[in-house]
Amino acid sequence: MTINTAVRIARLQVRVFRHPIERPVITSFGVMKDRPCVLVCVEDDQGVRGWGEVWCNFPSVGAEHRARLVNSVLWPMLEGRSFASPRQAFAQMSAATAVLAIQSGEPGPLAQAVAGVDLALWDLVARRAGLPLWRALREALGSPVDPTADHDPSEGDQRTVPTAATARHSAANGRIPVYASGINPDSAADPDGPRQLVARRRAEGYTAFKLKIGFEPERDLRSLRGVQEAAGPGADLMVDANQAWDLTTALARMPLFADFGLRWIEEPLRADVPWAHWQILRACSPAPLAAGENVAGDAAFDALLAARAVAVVQPDVAKWGGHSGNLPIVQRVLAAGLRHCPHYLGGGIGLRHAGHLLAATGGTGRLEIDANDNPLRTLLCGSIAQVSAGQVQLEDAPGIGAEPDLDAIREIKTLTL
């Protein structure tokens, strides 16, 4: 079928929520002491609504600012306008904010605001068509779903180029592999934290886990051993350094991880260093390298792909590009024989969008699901957090498959525009 992607925007509302948490989320560059969420709702002239989410984790005070960018910068250029597709709206928003991004020194927040609106528009289009979003995205790609496609999620060597047969998972039925991420290192106050969290998530059905590293070597290794033990035989392990090291330090740290059988090492270097540094590191890394959440724009992703230093590419739909920007990126990732594992660390609406993008595009990747407690994820994402044998099932309901329960989180709302 051919879906109608045209949309006339009648209304837009943006809301900010902040949920306090007992256990902060710790990274090598900062700490999250609450869980923020910026939700965008777009409504067309027929009363059909779509939902998106704007990345807003850092800096910790930035969520409300991003909401104001959506309302004050983007809404005036969208109100009452008709677009042939979300892609056209994305292109026009991106072009119209390009100079402002330079002048304000805020390319990131503006791109994140644009991404959130784009996500909402695609959800709207899919709901109106009566299709789950991943099916609508596949139709937009000109790739009707193959109902016979299937994939065993027990991947082999990550360096292997997928064949035509293996480059499809069971997303033909909306079922996608996932992994538990955001696992904090141990600490003096919580020495068994990583082990206990992984044990709980393993009992819930997760089979792959990613630990945050980039701290003292002894702490990294101690935490990783605890995670490995709690995960048990057959589990897949990954680590994320969150851009903690320069090349010299990374070269010294790589051998420490040689005996863990890691599926990938994520962001061992800053995302803005020359790709030549990544190529040097790749040559001696005991595991494939992963990056992409801090890459923005077609040219930047093309440079990443051309360097052939990264085997696992991790764009974030709420941080840059939405679906309009990321659909062609993911197509190029898969055509290059690399893995697309969408990055995501936020509320439930954005998580659903990331899962639908993975289901739409196929490949051998996994969806990232934050292992830490986050009511703004669990209250908003529904069944996508219900894991079985390392996979989740996306509903067949229209759009992202869920309507956010705003009443359940009303008391933690900090802003409505």
Per-range role (PLM):
Residues 4-19, 324, 328-329, 345-417:
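Flexible C-terminal active-site loop/helix
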Residues 192-204, 253-263:
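Alpha/beta enzyme core
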Residues 9, 40, 47, 74, ...:
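Conserved, mostly hydrophobic/aromatic
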Residues 211-351:
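Catalytic core of soluble alpha/beta enzymes
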Residues 6, 11, 43-128:
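Metal- or metallocofactor-binding catalytic centers and their adjacent structured scaffolds
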Residues 176-193, 241-246, 290:
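Active-site mouth loops of central-metabolism enzymes
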Residues 2-51, 55-59, 373-378:
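Structured beta-strand/loop patches that form or line metal/cofactor-binding pockets in enzymes
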Residues 140-173:
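Intrinsically disordered, low-complexity terminal tails and inter-domain linkers enriched
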